[in-house]
Each structure stands twice: as structure tokens, then as C-alpha cells.
Amino acid sequence: MTNIRKTHPLMEIINNAFIDLPAPSNISSWWNFGSLLGICLILQILTGLFLAMHYTSDTTTAFSSVTHICRDVNYGWIIRYMHANGASMFFICLFLHVGRGLYYGSYTFLETWNVGVILLFATMATAFMGYVLPWGQMSFWGATVITNLLSAIPYIGTNLVEWIWGGFSVDKATLTRFFAFHFILPFIITALAMVHLLFLHETGSNNPTGISSDTDKIPFHPYYTIKDILGALLLILALMLLVLFAPDLLGDPDNYTPANPLNTPPHIKPEWYFLFAYAILRSIPNELGGVLALVLSILILVLMPLLHTSKQRSMMFRPISQCMFWILVADLLTLTWIGGQPVEHPYIIIGQLASIMYFLLILVLMPAAGTIENNLLKW
């Protein structure tokens, strides 16, 4: 008798994706982040669902409803903080996952990579709208500032912003629609993640060497299931340490003040995971230029396959490219720091230099390093 997992139409899909899947024998812990992102997504949907049961998307009661969740709902505080800090864990995993893709040349799987970039944009949109929902000061002013950026688009900008707001300012209509979108987007992300996985399984996984591993495959289960479980336990440990010991570490104190359109906070800034892009936006004096740079800072990932000049796929054996990669990482950390600083003397110029360096590294220095390494191979 054939095993049910190989004959049942649904079980067969699960079997081919998570059990009998041929996987390279040498993939490192950097390949754990896909499954960790899946766990983060499930966790966010579940905690979000329970929060939505008690949340009200009305400007007069939104802030109070979040307070009510934390004070009166059974274990509401832990659900709320797991959701808020779960978003941070989600983005940590996302950045590491993308970084892994850049380092090991995984972007040569074009379809998988492009769906991944769409996933990144969708996740960023979801997180932004989620940050507006508690209706604190930073929620309100963050929503006002970021949506207002669209007014920089020539001709249609102002109409577009008012259409998104549902009025002439960020108000009840904005909050209600943001809640609706924040609820639906994670399910769209789940569907996109399945497409991402579908395209990945067409080619099979990359590996640290960047060389085809078709001659040396092992079954996904038990080898990588146990490895993923270890990763998941470490992720949950890190999340719960954050939730139980420092739940407000990554948040903004201003968000504990109810939204007030008449009082602007001294420093408007987004959550930490958007600071690098925010720093790039602020470093350009022209509004439209800043918005374009902001979008391009993420959209540039789509160009990565075109900018690959090396004869080798992975950076494992390319020391010059490795240097460029780690300079890029340091540059992104610098941008993240600058994004959280006020707009004054030393920070402005540091932000501008870091922004120039970001685009210079990706568009010029990394492709140049690949070409130099190709020539070194001839020696």
C-alpha cells in the first residue's frame, strides 16, 4: 500500500514541499530565515486576529481600545506586545533573509527574487498601516508625514493624498481604511509567500558555494525539519525575552500620548525598521527627489540580477565583494542610526554621505568588484 502522504492530493503538495523535498546537503543556518518568516507571519496573523476582536477603528475610541486590551482583556497585554515586537522580529528575519540572498547570489532565481521584493513592499506597507492603528501621537503624525509624501508626485499628488485620506486630513476615514487594509494584507502576503515557495521549488535551493547541488541532495525531513525547529525555538526565545522584559524597548514613548492634530511631536520618526529608508528620504533637500530615493532604496533590489558581473554566483570565494557587502551592511546600520536622530549639523551630512554610499556601493562598487575578481581569476 502506498503511503497516504504520496497519494492524497493535498498531502502530496505538503509532502513535496516539506518532507520529501530534495535539499542541498550543505545549506547553513542562513537558510533558516525562510521558515522563520513563515512562523512570524502565522504568529502575526493569530495575535492580530485576537487583537482585532477587541480593537475599534474609530478616532475617538481607538487609543482607549488598545489601553482596554492591555488592562482588561485576559492576557491582552501579552498578545499586544507579541504583535508589536513580532513585527520587529519579522523585519529582523526579513533583512537577514534578503542579506543572505545578496551574499550568496540567490537573486539569480529571478521569479523567486522578484516575488520576494513584492513581499518586502507588502510587508512594509502592512507594518506602516499597523503602526497607525493605536492612534497615538507618532501613529497620527507618522501617517500624516508619510502619506503627505505622495503630494510630491506632479499634477496628481494632492488629489491622490486626499483620496487616500478620505478627506482633507488624516481622520476617521483614514483610520478605518488603514485597519481594513492592515487586516487583509497579511493574507495577501501569505498567498504571495506560497507563490514565492512555488517558484523556489521549481529550481531548488541555492547553497553557500553557489554551485549546483543536484549531485548531492538530502531529504528535507528529518534533516532540515529539526534544524528549522531549532531556529524557531531560538526565534520564540528572542521574541519572548523582548516581550516579557523590554516590551517598549523598540517603541516610541510618544505613542503613549493620544493623537492630537494640534500638537506636533518634536521628532517625528517611524519604527526602527524603516529608519534607513527614512534617512535616505531626509538626506535629499528636494521633496520629489527624496520620495524617489526612498522608493528606489528598496526597488534597487530588483536590479541586483542585472548588476551581477562575477563569473561566480556566491560571494563565498570573492574577498573583494565580501568587503563591499560588509561595508554596505555597516552603511545601512549608519543610515538606521541617522534616521532616528534630529535634523541638525553632524547628522545631516553623515546621512547624505551614507545615502550616496548606499547607491554607489550597489550600482558601482559591487559590480566593479565582480569584474576585478573575474580578471584576477585569469592570473
From Swiss-Prot:
GO terms for biological process: mitochondrial electron transport, ubiquinol to cytochrome c. Heme b b562 binds at residues 83, 182. Heme b b566 binds at residues 97, 196. One of its GO terms (molecular function) is ubiquinol-cytochrome-c reductase activity. Pfam families: Cytochrom_B_C, Cytochrome_B. Keywords: Electron transport, Heme, Iron, Membrane, Metal-binding, Mitochondrion, Mitochondrion inner membrane, Respiratory chain, Transmembrane, Transmembrane helix, Transport, Ubiquinone. A ubiquinone binds at residue 201. It is a multi-pass membrane protein. It is found in: Mitochondrion inner membrane. One of its GO terms (cellular component) is respiratory chain complex III. Its main location: mitochondrion. Its cofactor is heme b. The chain crosses the membrane at residues 33-53, 77-98, 113-133, 178-198, 226-246, 288-308, 320-340, 347-367. Binds 2 heme b groups non-covalently. InterPro entries: Cyt_b/b6_C, Cyt_b/b6_C_sf, Cyt_b/b6_N, Cytb/b6-like_sf, Cytochrome_b, Cytochrome_b_C_euk/bac, Cytochrome_b_N_euk/bac, Di-haem_cyt_TM. Coiled coil: none annotated. Heme 1 (or BL or b562) is low-potential and absorbs at about 562 nm, and heme 2 (or BH or b566) is high-potential and absorbs at about 566 nm. Belongs to the cytochrome b family. The cytochrome bc1 complex contains 11 subunits: 3 respiratory subunits (MT-CYB, CYC1 and UQCRFS1), 2 core proteins (UQCRC1 and UQCRC2) and 6 low-molecular weight proteins (UQCRH/QCR6, UQCRB/QCR7, UQCRQ/QCR8, UQCR10/QCR9, UQCR11/QCR10 and a cleavage product of UQCRFS1). This cytochrome bc1 complex then forms a dimer. Component of the ubiquinol-cytochrome c reductase complex (complex III or cytochrome b-c1 complex) that is part of the mitochondrial respiratory chain. The b-c1 complex mediates electron transfer from ubiquinol to cytochrome c. Contributes to the generation of a proton gradient across the mitochondrial membrane that is then used for ATP synthesis. This is Cytochrome b. It comes from Connochaetes gnou. The gene is MT-CYB.
